């Protein structure tokens, strides 16, 4: 069900910086009624929305991209993609608890993403992450323990149930890997171009 998975402990220094950033930095809230904005509060704000750094470019943790860059390099190598592609990746952090909302079903595919991933930093006892099929059935995959890193196709619909356990903050780092170039085994080179914003075109070249 997963493309790749591994249990990986986030270094203590990164974890502490991440927690401090969530507590202290201006954060973005996102309501399901479509409204959104910046607030000086965090996931515990009066909107009771889960914390997300997805829309907040100012949310930066020193060393976070380097840490996940090495994890992604290992994953891409084991998938046979490290030597055959050029890629970039993005990260965001989310945090949920019993007093906040959670994440409705959605997907991550816009045309160039090849892999989505989720790293559960602090887990709940009950599994929250699920995939959703065409009949809107929820499928709860694999292990979802603290430290579990797992990847899946970005077109797959997924979500997270509301946290029901008291005094628990479910913390994750999620992201997407997007291809810019791909080399097949028959001397073809595929290049993903963006002629205009959010418009992706794949071109194929014979080498």
Each predicted region: which residue ranges?
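Non-heme Fe(II)/2-oxoglutarate
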Residues: 1-83
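Long amphipathic alpha-helical segments
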Residues: 186-193
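Short, cationic low-complexity segments
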Residues: 30, 193-207
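Generic detection of short hydrophobic beta-strand segments and adjacent strand-loop junctions
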Residues: 6-8, 140-144, 205
């Amino acid at each position: 069900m997963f493309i790749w998975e591994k249990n990986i402990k986030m270094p203590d220094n990164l974890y502490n910086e991440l927690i401090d950033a969530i507590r202290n930095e201006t954060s973005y809230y996102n309501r399901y009624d479509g409204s959104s904005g910046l607030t000086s509060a965090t996931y515990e704000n009066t909107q009771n929305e889960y914390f997300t750094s997805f829309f907040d470019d100012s949310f930066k943790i020193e060393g976070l991209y380097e840490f996940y860059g090495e994890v992604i390099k290992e994953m891409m190598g084991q998938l046979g993609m490290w030597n055959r592609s050029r890629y970039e990746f993005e990260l965001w952090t989310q945090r949920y608890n019993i007093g906040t909302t959670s994440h409705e079903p959605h997907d991550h595919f816009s045309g160039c993403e090849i892999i989505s991933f989720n790293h559960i930093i602090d887990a709940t006892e009950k599994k929250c992450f699920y995939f959703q099929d065409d009949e809107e059935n929820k499928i709860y995959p694999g292990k979802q323990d603290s430290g579990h890193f797992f990847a899946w196709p970005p077109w797959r619909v997924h979500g997270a149930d509301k946290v029901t356990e008291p005094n628990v903050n479910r913390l994750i780092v999620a992201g997407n890997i997007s291809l810019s170039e791909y080399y097949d085994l028959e001397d073809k080179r595929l290049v993903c171009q963006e002629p205009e914003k959010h418009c992706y075109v794949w071109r194929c070249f014979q080498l």
